[in-house]
């Protein structure tokens, strides 16, 4: 009925054994993900698919798992977060190559959570600078590194964040069930 399926390979699920090996924090562990993608190519009928998402929201996984520590593996280490983010870039690129070799017609990309990041004080130079850095790190750093290894970008938008310096200073309403400030106009 006009519905086109998208296969999402990785949506933050990390097996315990992979986590015990430090998951995506170790570059050598990317090989396990590559094997998973290759096995999936052989076991699924990917010839009938057109779209594959290799990674869902790598920025969200990295920040909540390795910066805020709110989600597994519940670490608070910016350096580890940077390694994880970099290794997810490598994992995507390698997966892209494996999938294209298996079926060159596939359209492959990531689902990116892109936030509307704004300065709380629009004319304050420090807030503007921080906002530009945050926007780049959250929205564009990953996508810029995979630009030659993607056929599309899945766009997920959930919130607007306002920054005063390095502190998030969002209005208190309206918020969703996760406590995220909602601003539908931010998608424009």
Annotate each PLM feature.
Residues 1-188:
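Non-catalytic scaffold segments within catalytic domains of secreted glycoside hydrolases
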């Amino acid at each position: 009925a006009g519905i086109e399926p998208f296969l999402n390979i990785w949506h933050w699920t990390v097996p315990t054994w992979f986590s015990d090996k430090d998951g995506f924090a170790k570059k050598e562990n990317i090989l396990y993900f590559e094997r998973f993608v290759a096995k999936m190519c052989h076991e699924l009928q990917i010839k009938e698919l057109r779209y594959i998402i290799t990674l869902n929201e790598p920025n969200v996984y990295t920040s909540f798992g390795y910066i805020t520590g709110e989600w597994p593996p519940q670490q608070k280490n910016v350096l580890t977060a940077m390694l994880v983010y970099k290794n997810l870039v490598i994992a995507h690129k390698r997966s892209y190559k494996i999938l294209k070799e298996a079926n060159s017609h596939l359209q492959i990309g990531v689902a990116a959570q892109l936030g509307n990041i704004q300065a709380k004080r629009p004319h304050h130079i420090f807030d503007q600078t921080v906002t530009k850095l945050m926007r780049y790190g959250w929205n564009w750093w990953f996508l810029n590194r995979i630009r030659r290894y993607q056929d599309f970008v899945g766009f997920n938008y959930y919130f607007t964040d306002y920054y005063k310096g390095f502190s998030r200073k969002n209005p208190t309403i309206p918020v969703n069930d996760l406590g995220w400030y909602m601003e539908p106009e931010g998608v424009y």
